[in-house]
Structures are given as structure tokens and as C-alpha cells.
Regions:
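Short, acidic, metal-binding catalytic loop of nucleotide-sugar glycosyltransferases
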Residues: 89, 109-121
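Active-site rim elements
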Residues: 178-179, 248, 273-282, 318, ...
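Short, well-formed alpha-helical segments that are part of the catalytic scaffolds
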Residues: 76-79, 102-114
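Active-site-proximal specificity loops/subdomain of glycosyltransferases
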Residues: 126-202
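C-terminal catalytic/acceptor-binding lobe
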Residues: 3, 8-66, 282-288, 293-511
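Conserved catalytic core of nucleotide-sugar-dependent glycosyltransferases
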Residues: 204, 212-292, 296, 309, ...
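A conserved hydrophobic helix/loop-capping motif in glycosyltransferases and polysaccharide synthases
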Residues: 93-101
């Protein structure tokens, strides 16, 4: 009996073990809380970030757009839910056009960014191709053989089909660029026909190039709420350009057709595609031919949606008057790295409002602005000052000569501006008020924000742009140097004087 009482039952042993574990857990909790109560070291935020990473399905990275003083974006890029804030695109279809010589350079970035959030889209090219699970349709597959047979514009089309390896190996995109351009114009009308056949009855059709970026949140808000347009009407929207007096929506900037207009064009006029295929050899551009067909058959002209539908990219946008509080719907000439950067900016922006041109400047361009850059072209060309010597005048490009300020209208600083980049830099500074206490109205009316100097030509600009690098000159003479500079004081004063954009400056797309 005594022995029996000395031997504990299995249940009692389990209770004792559980008690010991509970006690140890309590001690561990107290130690943990005590450490948390202590002042957090500088590395605490990083340690906390590391501890929560496992809770995200995707990865969290340092945001490469984040810099000291740039409070537009979050310091971390959480890629676990890239489509969480993507708008509802029901009734809207994207149709993107590319070329076989560029598809594998341009399309993958689109597919990894904005296109990854679209439930459906169509891709067209001048050759049928496959990128992973995504199919690219040949817009010219049904083009009449008789129209192609004796047309040199189709030499590239035939060469691409005969290439037994990758297009990169057979076709030099740089040297064959003009051939790709000549071939491209034939895709527009056949693409309309195939789009309607494959994806009929959408409210809106957005057509874009492989170097076009679309701000989808802005675009859907504008089409469905802000514009006031009814897709049951025949509508053609874009950034208007002119050739020979004919207005058309610039293809690279992107353009929009209402479903009603596309249906009418294709279903009511079955011969339009064939007719314009023949016309193509005598016209320069496919976007022009589309506009001609819409006017001829539907009596519809393009409605101007610029600068919202825009032909520039962040580094070439002319920030300033007319390009500030306006929302952006598209941008053009975007390479893959730029597309990725703008997507990243949209993903990591701290604010959830309509994205305006000002936001692009403050988030992507302002952190890179500095007083001057050598071997750089910031695209200043609004007002020019050129060496008055006849030989120098002949040497200068006609575009710059046409924008010279008259000698009798120049002040003393401007008369010396062509002599050196240092002199050129003084032109914008000469507009500053002596007491630096000018009114906001005066600051808002500033007309000189930056300069560019090269070969005794000094030009200033009424807006501010970042621009792009120029090769260092082989000529050792100082006048061959490219120099660009920004009057940061004037730029920042203008921005302060403008104040906050209280409301997005939506533009009414009018004829």
C-alpha cells in the first residue's frame, strides 16, 4: 500500500510536466516583455520588419525609389498583393500592339506589372508568337496576298517568317527599324476587325503600343465616372495630332474607341479593312489611316484628351504651367525599366488619390534634380540665344534659330548668354526679384526654369524637365560640351506659389 502511494499515477506526472512547461513559458514571456519595455535600439525597426516578413505571402523589399526627403513613397515594397487596389475593368478591354523584333524586349515587363492585374487583354504583332502562357496574334494574318506580293513594306514580314531561330538572331532591330515602322501602319485596321471578332460588345476599347504606360486607376475613373461619356455613343478619344490637316489620335500615346463606334466601323462597313490595306502604301502612318476611316465611314473625329493622354514620359514631361494638377491617363516612349519604375511608384505611393502630373514629378523626378549636369540635354528649347556671328548662325539648327530672342529685346545678361554655359545659367537667375519678396502671382508667372548650352547656343525653357544624357564630345574644345542646368530656386518658388492641387484638373475631351 505504501509503495503504491509512492508511485504517482501517469495522470499526476503529466500534470507536473505541464506545470513545469507553463512556468517556463511564463518566465520566457516576462523576459520578452521586459526586453520590449527597454528603450528600442536604432535597429529595432529593421528587426521588426524582418520578424513580420514571414506573414506576407510574397516578398517585402527595400523600396529602391525611396530616398531621404522623398516622402511620396513607402520605404518598403510589399509585392504580396500587387492587384489589391487595381480598379474594376469590367466592360473595358486593352488591345496592345507590338512587333516581332521588339516583343521579347518590351512585353515581359508589361506582363509582370500592369497586365498581370487585367482579367483579359489582346496582344497583336506582325507575327504570331508566344511569351510563356500569353499568345500574340498576327494582325496581318488575313492580309490579302495580292496586296502583299509586290509591296516592299512586307519584306520584313516575310523575313521574320523564314527565320529558323530567334528573331534576335535573324533581325537587327536597330538597322531594320525603318522596315518595322513601314510594316506597322498596316496593322491598325486589321487589328480593329480581329478585336471585334474575338472580343465583341465591350463598352470601351483602349489601344496602346508596347512603349505605352496606362495609369489604370485614373483611366477607369475617367471613363466610368468623370468624363460623362456614354459608350453607346460613337466616341474616339486620344492625344490629337495633325498630318496634312487631318486630325488623328496619336497611336503611341494610346487612344480609346467606344464599343458602339468599333461595332459600327466593322459590322456596317465590311470593305473598310481591305480598302485601307491598299491605301497603306501611300500613307505614312496607321493611326492616321484609322482616323481617315473613322471620318470617312462614321463621320467621327478624334476628341482631344491631352495632356491626360500624353506622348511624353516622366523624364521628358514639361512640368510647369499646364502640366501640373492634370491627371495622367497614359505616357509614351517608355522603355522596360521606366515601365517597371512607374508601376513600382504606383504600388508604393503613400496617398490613394487621383495621380496627377505633380505627383510624378515629386515622386520620380524631384529627387534627381540638381543645379547642373555635364554631358546632358534637358531639352530646353523655348527661347534661344545664339552667337550673332553669321557662321555660328549657319551652324545652329534651324529650330533654334527660329526661337531666338530679338537682339533689341535682350537684357545685358541675355546678350552674353551664348558665350559659355556659366553665362547661360545666369539667364533664369536674372528673373529673380532683387528683394526676393515677390508675390505668389509673380512667382507663378515665371517663364525661365532651366537652360541647355552647346556649341555657342544657349536655350532656356518655360517648364522644367529632366532630359537624358549626351555622349561626351570627342572635340576637346569647350564649346562642344553639352551642359544643362536647373534654376532650382525658381522651380521651388513656383511650386510653393502654386500650392496644393485642391482638385485634379480634368480636361474635357472636346472636338
Amino acid at each position: 500500500m505504501q509503495l503504491a502511494t509512492m508511485i504517482a499515477s501517469p495522470n499526476s506526472r503529466r500534470f507536473r510536466v505541464a506545470g513545469v512547461i507553463a512556468a517556463l513559458a511564463l518566465v520566457a514571456l516576462i523576459l520578452h516583455l521586459r526586453l520590449r519595455w527597454q528603450p528600442a535600439p536604432f535597429e529595432y525597426a529593421h528587426e521588426y520588419y524582418q520578424s513580420v516578413r514571414s506573414y506576407f505571402k510574397g516578398s517585402v523589399y527595400n523600396n529602391t525609389l525611396y530616398t531621404d526627403g522623398n516622402d511620396m513613397v513607402d520605404p518598403y515594397f510589399n509585392s504580396s498583393a500587387p492587384c489589391a487596389n487595381f480598379p474594376n475593368t469590367d466592360g473595358v478591354l486593352l488591345v496592345m500592339k507590338t512587333g516581332a523584333t521588339e516583343a521579347f524586349d518590351r512585353m515581359p515587363t508589361h506582363l509582370l506589372t500592369t497586365l498581370s492585374c487585367l482579367p483579359d487583354f489582346l496582344l497583336f504583332s506582325d507575327m504570331e508568337q508566344q511569351i510563356g502562357p500569353y499568345h500574340i496574334f498576327d494582325a496581318l494574318a488575313e492580309f490579302e496576298e495580292s496586296a502583299k506580293a509586290h509591296n516592299d513594306d512586307f519584306d520584313l514580314y516575310r523575313n521574320q517568317k523564314e527565320c529558323p531561330v530567334s528573331q534576335k538572331s535573324c533581325i537587327d532591330a536597330k538597322s531594320e527599324g525603318h522596315k518595322a515602322w513601314n510594316l506597322d501602319k498596316y496593322k491598325f485596321l486589321p487589328m480593329m476587325e480581329q478585336t471585334w471578332r474575338m472580343r465583341p460588345n465591350h463598352d470601351w476599347y483602349i489601344f496602346a503600343e508596347a512603349d505605352t504606360y496606362i495609369f489604370w486607376a485614373n483611366m477607369i475613373h475617367w471613363l466610368k465616372k468623370q468624363s460623362g461619356f456614354d459608350p453607346r455613343e460613337k466616341l474616339y478619344l486620344g492625344s490629337r495630332s495633325f498630318i496634312g490637316g487631318t486630325p488623328f489620335a496619336h497611336g503611341g500615346s494610346g487612344y480609346i474607341l467606344s464599343g458602339t463606334l468599333l461595332r459600327h466601323l466593322i459590322e456596317y462597313h465590311p470593305g473598310v479593312v481591305k480598302q485601307y490595306n491598299v491605301k497603306g502604301s501611300n500613307e505614312c502612318c496607321g493611326d492616321l489611316m484609322l482616323a481617315m476611316a473613322l471620318e470617312e465611314y462614321e463621320s467621327v473625329k478624334v476628341r482631344q484628351a491631352w495632356p491626360m493622354i500624353n506622348g511624353e514620359k516622366p523624364s521628358t514631361l514639361p512640368y510647369g504651367p499646364g502640366h501640373w494638377c492634370e491627371p495622367l491617363l497614359t505616357m509614351h516612349h517608355m522603355n522596360s525599366e521606366e515601365i517597371s519604375s512607374v508601376w513600382q511608384f504606383e504600388q508604393t505611393r503613400k496617398v490613394d488619390r487621383i495621380l496627377m502630373i505633380r505627383d510624378v514629378y515629386e515622386g520620380l523626378i524631384q529627387p534627381k534634380m540638381q543645379v547642373s549636369r555635364a554631358n546632358w540635354d534637358n531639352l530646353s528649347d523655348d527661347v534661344c540665344y545664339i552667337n550673332p556671328d553669321p557662321e555660328a548662325q549657319d551652324r545652329a539648327e534651324g529650330h533654334f534659330r527660329d526661337r531666338q530672342k530679338k537682339q533689341e529685346d535682350m537684357n545685358d545678361v541675355e546678350k552674353e548668354a551664348w558665350k559659355s554655359w556659366e553665362n547661360c545659367a545666369k539667364v533664369c537667375a536674372s528673373q529673380d526679384e532683387p528683394d526676393d519678396k515677390s508675390s505668389n502671382e509673380k512667382k507663378r508667372s515665371r517663364t525661365c526654369f532651366q537652360y541647355r548650352w552647346h556649341e555657342e547656343v544657349c536655350c532656356t525653357a518655360k517648364s522644367f524637365k529632366l532630359g537624358a544624357p549626351k555622349p561626351a564630345p570627342g572635340d576637346s574644345s569647350s564649346k562642344a560640351k553639352w551642359m544643362s542646368g536647373w534654376h532650382l530656386k525658381g522651380i521651388n518658388e513656383w511650386i510653393d506659389a502654386m500650392g496644393e492641387c485642391k482638385e485634379p484638373a480634368w480636361k474635357k475631351a472636346e472636338l
